[in-house]
Design a protein with these regions (language model features):
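Extracellular/periplasmic bilobal clamshell ligand-binding domains
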Residues: 78, 89, 184-191
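Structural motif
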Residues: 20-23, 48, 70-84, 153-157
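Beta-alpha junction/loop-to-helix N-cap segments that form part of ligand/metal-binding clefts
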Residues: 1-7, 13, 71-78, 98-103
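Periplasmic-binding protein-like
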Residues: 38-41, 89-99, 105, 116-121, ...
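Extracellular/periplasmic periplasmic-binding protein-like sensory domains
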Residues: 106-179
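Extracytoplasmic "Venus flytrap"
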Residues: 40-49, 97-100, 148-149, 171-177
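Extracytoplasmic ligand/sensor domains, especially the bilobed periplasmic-binding protein
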Residues: 1-68, 117-142, 150
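Second-shell loop/turn segments in exported
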Residues: 8-14, 83, 143-150, 167-172, ...
Length: 191
């Protein structure tokens, strides 16, 4: 997260994790109207940053955090922690995972018949890594992401259409961020 604090010629094309975490907190408290939440936190800088921002906003707006459980990236077995969360019966599970881990969490939650709503970050915004792996278990999952697929901006719409034509799948946040970075480099070269 501190990489872009290094100087005036270092840029970021996406928001910091704690900012996106606050967006998740807003989504949980205001849009999904959750009163209680369990947090599944990927144990790295990104996951920790998301969790910090989420908890900061959510608790300030009346959401009670029932549990905070960390997991290592690449974890395969989430059933024990999901069983614990099922007993707590939160209104919402906030999941900071990347695509594959997030998909496994959803599949294992479905296997345990957990009906709790799930909120994730841009880490889940991946057609191949998340949606194809999670399958039907991804139905109803809400994510916060900086890719606005409803944008009327012609650059965005052109990107969305051409990406799908080129690769045969819907674009995700990672591809969009890469495209933004490329456009920034092109603009800098022109100037």
């Amino acid at each position: 997260p501190a990489v872009t604090a290094g100087g005036k010629y270092v840029f970021r094309v996406t928001v910091l994790g704690h900012v996106q975490g606050r967006a998740g907190g807003y989504t949980a408290a205001k849009l999904m109207e959750a009163k209680t939440v369990s947090m599944l936190i990927m144990d790295n800088d990104f996951g920790q940053s998301l969790a910090k921002g989420f908890k900061e906003y959510a608790t300030k707006h009346g959401v009670k955090v029932l549990s905070e459980d960390k997991f290592k990236m690449g974890e395969k077995e989430f059933s024990p922690v999901l069983t614990k969360i099922k007993k707590l019966n939160p209104d919402l599970i906030y999941n900071t995972a990347y695509p594959h881990d997030g998909a496994l969490i959803l599949k294992q939650a479905a296997d345990l018949d957990i009906q709790t709503k799930m909120l994730g970050s841009e880490g889940l915004d991946s057609t191949k890594g998340f949606l194809e792996v999670a399958g039907k278990a991804a139905e109803g999952v809400v994510i916060t992401t900086n890719l606005d697929r409803d944008s009327k901006n012609p650059i965005t719409q052109n990107y969305l259409i051409n990406y799908e034509k080129q690769y045969g799948i819907a674009p995700d946040m990672t591809g969009a961020s890469t495209y933004d970075a490329f456009l920034m480099v092109v603009d800098a070269i022109k100037k």
